[in-house]
Regions:
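Charged docking surfaces used in two-component/phosphorelay signaling
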Residues: 12-20
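Receiver (REC) domain active-site loop signature in two-component systems and cognate sites
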Residues: 52
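Active-site beta3 strand of CheY-like receiver
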Residues: 41-47
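Short hydrophobic/Thr-rich beta-strand motif most characteristic of the beta2 strand and flanking loop
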Residues: 22-29, 37
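C-terminal output helix
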Residues: 103-113
Length: 136
């Protein structure tokens, strides 16, 4: 599990909640830090903020999807960007779930757990369901 957010408070909030649920959690401060760490950590799931310095979440998610070594890692965008265009862009990139801040830690845990188990995420969560790539 890799938690990527430039806001230390949010990064630690996510990391602590996931650690308490039994996840082995590493953190990164931005997209570049994520890419630098991802191969060594080999996470099943990455939570990723969008608005970050150096390398934003959009580009980070795109680069993860394009790289054969990281293309199957589940990506959950957790962001303050709640516009429909942002959610659509997430689907186009191929993120697995999209949660908006402020988020419910319980819902975030359910989504991450479902993705880590490679099961579909909770369909009752509007943002999560909207964040999935459309099936062809």
């Amino acid at each position: 599990m890799l938690v990527v957010d430039d806001d230390e408070v949010i990064r630690q909030l996510i990391a602590v909640n996931l650690t308490l649920e039994g996840f082995d959690v590493a953190t990164a401060v931005d997209g570049q830090d994520c890419l630098d760490k991802v191969t060594a950590i080999d996470p099943d799931v990455i939570t990723l903020d969008i608005m970050m310095p150096r390398l934003d979440g959009w580009m980070t998610a795109s680069l993860l999807r394009r790289n054969p070594d990281t293309s199957t890692i589940k990506v959950v965008l957790i962001t303050a960007r709640a516009q429909e265009d942002d959610k659509k862009r997430g689907r186009q990139i191929g993120v697995d779930a999209y949660l908006t801040k402020p988020f419910d830690p319980g819902e975030m845990i359910r989504v991450v757990r479902a993705l880590a188990a490679r099961e579909p995420a909770d369909q009752t969560a509007e943002d999560t369901a909207e964040g999935r790539p459309e099936q062809a």
